[in-house]
Regions:
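Flexible "cap/lid" subdomain of the alpha/beta-hydrolase fold that forms the substrate-access gate
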Residues: 2-170
């Protein structure tokens, strides 16, 4: 959105993992409610304030380990090979339900790294990061000028083979 709103100040765009989508006719939250009706979807789970916070803050280390390690290449490969998909969970599931656990840390994460993250989130809590998801409806209402917006600057989108965004296809729903 920054590039579409500030064309003269942004010379190029590189998107990582999350592709750009212009503002549509309905909000992404309303779209997700239609697409995932009767199914679990993490962004809908995050909407009710306090629910995800309570689950994650119960054991921040477990939340971080399960989240990070289930969506890295090893975790996504495991989920693909075992036909595990978050949309197969019911609408009343919790976020951590059914997420695969691993006995070892991947090479890109050390115990010291995890200790630091746990310490930071124990101090700040999870509300701030989750509020970004909750602001989607506000963005939809406030950014009418982004309807059908296009990124006019030179741009590229980069994703990895096992990036979770590649598995959010409607085919899986």
């Amino acid at each position: 959105n920054t590039a579409a709103l500030n064309e003269s100040r942004i010379s190029a765009v590189l998107g990582l993992s999350v592709p750009f989508f212009p503002r549509g006719k309905i909000s992404t939250i309303d779209l997700f409610k239609k697409i995932y009706q009767g199914k679990f979807f993490y962004q809908l789970y995050f909407q009710e304030e306090g629910v995800a916070e309570a689950e994650f803050e119960e054991n921040i280390r477990k939340y971080l380990e399960l989240t990070y390690f289930s969506i890295d290449a090893r975790g996504m490969r495991f989920q693909k090979e075992n036909a595990i998909n978050a949309s197969s969970k019911g609408p009343n599931a919790r976020y951590l339900d059914g997420i695969p656990e691993f006995d070892t840390y991947p090479s890109w994460m050390t115990n010291e790294d995890m200790d630091y993250l746990v310490s930071e989130f124990e101090n700040s809590g999870m509300r701030g990061p989750l509020n970004r998801y909750r602001a989607q409806q506000i963005d939809f209402e406030d950014l009418l000028e982004l309807t059908d917006a296009k990124i006019k600057q030179p741009s590229a989108f980069l994703t990895g083979k096992y990036d979770p965004v590649n598995f959010l296809s409607l085919i899986h729903i």
